[in-house]
Amino acid sequence: MLLGPEVQARQQLHHEDAIALAQLPAEAQSVHRLIRAGGPFTHSKDGAVFGNRERALPTRPRGFYREYTVATPGARDRGARRIVCGGREPKAPDACFYTADHYISFHRITP
């Protein structure tokens, strides 16, 4: 059965796609610590609202999710790796997700 891209994106996030914080690349672990500390962040777009237009994350009101850049060694720009966290308090998010492919797939970060 063929599925449209929106349905496929929504189906990509599954419980088995969780990843332990210790399994993330060192750069992502560092960004996760900075998120919890409230910064400082390297990129001006870090902490910007993530719109979840791809609908790959659970649906929440606009402004719930914020995105942070995870440095990609050798990349001249921000690269594809991000951490997206959601919650009322940016320093104490309800959940964080890691993407290594610029929002195509996400892995929920677990302790």
Residues covered by each model-derived region:
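Functional cores of ribonucleases/endoribonucleases
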Residues: G39-P111
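C-terminal segment of classical bacterial N-terminal signal peptides
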Residues: M1-V7
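N-terminal secretory signal peptides
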Residues: V7-P58
